[in-house]
């Protein structure tokens, strides 16, 4: 929707954002399209750290934001590791951009790291992108994955190892990404405490925007 210029009709994702962020300029005809530039919140982490649980609770409690689970758009066509899943990230940023035009920022829950989003063409449409990574200790994550329902297929050794590796990477590299990620260890806190911590993190950035 937003990528189509109302004046010339061209589809351009690479619109030029004016300094104050109130307009996106069509590179084809120069038309200034007014839009709302809001922050985006990315809630990331390995499988089993509590993203989906937090997402469900936040959707019911966080009325000032739109909370979404990124897996709902996953299709085989997006399984492109050679591009670091670029089309998948661009698609989600485009969805979040359009939703935010209703005046509410989006909280997107799903695995991902800053490098996968910050390089995207659609990134320019957000005032900031804030990243919170849920993590936990190896033993806790292993137990959670192996005790999930069988249909999820998360008890297999290779699946467990893959997500242990990603979890460790987040812990080791959170401060070195651009921008840095905030870490939240969910191992020793309840679900309610975890959700409350995510809420505080979101509100702290909303109040600072």
Per-region residue spans from a language model:
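Conserved phosphate-donor/acceptor-positioning beta-strand/loop module used by diverse small-molecule
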Residues: 125-147, 184
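Small-molecule kinase domains that catalyze NTP-dependent phosphoryl transfer to phosphate-bearing small molecules
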Residues: 151-197, 209
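Walker A (P-loop) phosphate-binding loop of P-loop NTPases
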Residues: 48
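Conserved substrate/cofactor phosphate-moiety recognition/catalytic segment
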Residues: 55-97
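Hydrophobic anchor at the beta1->P-loop junction of P-loop NTPases
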Residues: 43
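Short cysteine-rich clusters marking metal-coordination/redox-active sites
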Residues: 5-8, 26-29
